[in-house]
Amino acid sequence: MPLLNEVARQRAIIYRWFSQLLFQELSDEGLLRLRDKENLALLNALKLIPELSLLVTHFQRRLRAMLKREECRLELAADFASLFLLPAPSGVSPYAGHYPHTNSPEERQALRQKLVEHRLAPQNNEAVDHIAIQLALMTALIEEGVEREQQDLFLNRHLLSWLPLCTKRCYQRDRFGFYAAAMGLLTGFVQQDSEWLIACRLATHPARPGQS
């Protein structure tokens, strides 16, 4: 594995954090991690990005409110199930293939092959286009030092093509608001990450006069 610079390391940590948050109902251990200093430091780091400041603040408010619930783990598990496990129109699908303008069957097969190559293929019949699995693959691409152009291509083909619509539906249907706030922050981060990758590419390979 290549030696990661600090920016790449932090990006991988953030994508892994979102993947773990959205994969399934949080365990007691998962809830404890949301309270720890590392989680606080991660959110504070994201808050330093101006475009994410309000999204982080909103997520922190929903997180604090969630942790004050009497049976917070059980109630949060119920929130997760009612939002992501129920079919539409009650729930919101966390699968890319359920949204328009996403990938073709051939591209989904290529995605499955990538997951096999990175030893991330789901073992429990989970579809490869689940949001958490795609975020885990993005983490692996960063950690393996895949070219930034390919990382941005992955973000746009497999995440940004459907995340905004998914997030909009979460805001409409998540009654408590914790997971909607998490999805809003995720979408904002992915958009900013894509813009950063583009800026890095332009700085490395500036357009020549006359090129668009």
From Swiss-Prot:
<dbReference type="Pfam" id="PF02613">
    <property type="entry name" value="Nitrate_red_del"/>
</dbReference>
<keyword id="KW-0143">Chaperone</keyword>
<dbReference type="GO" id="GO:0005737">
    <property type="term" value="C:cytoplasm"/>
</dbReference>
<protein>
    <recommendedName>
        <fullName>Chaperone protein TorD</fullName>
    </recommendedName>
</protein>
<dbReference type="InterPro" id="IPR036411">
    <property type="entry name" value="TorD-like_sf"/>
</dbReference>
<dbReference type="GO" id="GO:0006457">
    <property type="term" value="P:protein folding"/>
</dbReference>
<dbReference type="InterPro" id="IPR020945">
    <property type="entry name" value="DMSO/NO3_reduct_chaperone"/>
</dbReference>
<dbReference type="InterPro" id="IPR050289">
    <property type="entry name" value="TorD/DmsD_chaperones"/>
</dbReference>
<comment type="function">
    <text>Involved in the biogenesis of TorA. Acts on TorA before the insertion of the molybdenum cofactor and, as a result, probably favors a conformation of the apoenzyme that is competent for acquiring the cofactor.</text>
</comment>
<comment type="similarity">
    <text>Belongs to the TorD/DmsD family. TorD subfamily.</text>
</comment>
<keyword id="KW-0963">Cytoplasm</keyword>
<dbReference type="InterPro" id="IPR023069">
    <property type="entry name" value="Chaperone_TorD"/>
</dbReference>
